[in-house]
């Protein structure tokens, strides 16, 4: 019988992008704010958006300052999100060797800063992940590929990666499970944002009905199906006289609100090394109305997951009328309540979290 998991509470600074971009906080100040609010102990950053000069410009002086800061405020680096920018060149896509070199620099910085995990992205193929395994071994960093809508745990691309992981049998290869893949409704806060942009109620009703229909059909298991759904949102906006909203509907309706059922995570659960607690808002009842946070936490606990959950508030893209710190506070309260209801607890003590995270990442995949 699997022992109950004890997930580690944490947050990604991505949740506070609006405040960071508005220069309300610099990196030092935002990390201190996170610690003071009790949003840790887990701390996740995105390399290119949080760290000036990433990756080549990260010198030893900055590394020392960063490590000293997180030690001072008693936070634990959990995951550094790194990018797979295969299309960064104007003339062609990166070739295999260029991609490995590009990723290697970022993985090295993750290790220097003290992050045990580098979140990588779905555009990495099984062959690329296999080529990066020696890099992961060199630096002692787990590569956790993010499973993000429109993909999900049972998507063909994800299963191909899982099968390669099983063949390679290394604890340094795994997944970051992003809860946006398993959403149960169109976010009310986004509908409100569309209202504020002048969208008619009838159009919003049709958007919700279209998404609900895709939810009933089940998740897209191929890129072809995803493309058809993407186009359906664009067509709806055009027919309704709001073509300016078409791409917005499509990106959010397919790329943020994934309609996969929760049990699709079971296809890859043994390889889940990190979790993005993706959510979009907290309602007047103190709950997330479109992401089944309680069920997701229970699933992790019951399957023995003891890694970090980085609360990832994505509603900042459109919600400029609510405080993201209040919203994170509310969502983490839901996580703690859900873990308790499942017979366990979220880990909020830094010393205990360090021990548990080290053990979680050291375990064989099927240990």
Swiss-Prot record:
Its EC number is 4.1.99.-. InterPro entries: Xyl_isomerase-like_sf. It catalyses: 3''-dehydroisovitexin = 1,5-anhydro-D-erythro-hex-1-en-3-ulose + apigenin. Its cofactor is Mg(2+). Optimum temperature is around 40 degrees Celsius. One of its GO terms (molecular function) is metal ion binding. Keywords: Carbohydrate metabolism, Lyase, Magnesium, Metal-binding. Optimum pH is 7.5. SUPFAM superfamilies: Xylose isomerase-like (SSF51658). Belongs to the C-glycoside deglycosidase alpha subunit family. This is C-glycoside deglycosidase alpha subunit. It comes from Arthrobacter globiformis (strain ATCC 8010 / DSM 20124 / JCM 1332 / NBRC 12137 / NCIMB 8907 / NRRL B-2979 / 168).
